[in-house]
């Protein structure tokens, strides 16, 4: 595995772990717990689905799986923003999650764009 891929894999795993720890700190209210569950699913989904891209059997499958990672990153960012706007959760941890979710979404948006272009170029050569 190339070093950049491993670095990103480690980064998304760190994000998932921070999400898990953050969700544990949310208030035991209906809104805190429900939004926390949504964030937990999306935040850990970024890591799990990125890990799954390494098992892609084709370029098309890789592009599709990377698209799922982007969707999960986008959703995680959404739920973090909801928590922020609803004033639920601790400041520093929440701010780190907001920043990291936005950065991961941007990384995966560009990755999907690049992977699609590479796939189209490869498909056109055949």
Name each model feature, range by range.
Residues 1-126:
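Amphipathic alpha-helical assembly/interaction segments
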């Amino acid at each position: 595995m190339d070093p950049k891929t491993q670095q990103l894999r480690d980064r998304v795993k760190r994000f998932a772990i921070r999400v898990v720890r953050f969700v544990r700190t949310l208030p035991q209210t209906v809104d805190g717990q429900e939004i926390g569950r949504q964030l937990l699913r999306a935040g850990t989904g970024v890591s799990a689905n990125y890990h799954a891209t390494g098992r892609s059997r084709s370029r098309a499958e890789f592009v599709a799986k990377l698209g799922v990672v982007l969707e999960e990153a986008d959703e995680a960012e959404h739920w973090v923003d909801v928590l922020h706007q609803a004033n639920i959760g601790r400041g520093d941890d929440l701010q780190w999650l907001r920043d990291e979710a936005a950065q991961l979404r941007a990384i995966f948006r560009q990755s999907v764009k690049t992977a699609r272009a590479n796939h189209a170029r490869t498909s056109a050569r055949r």
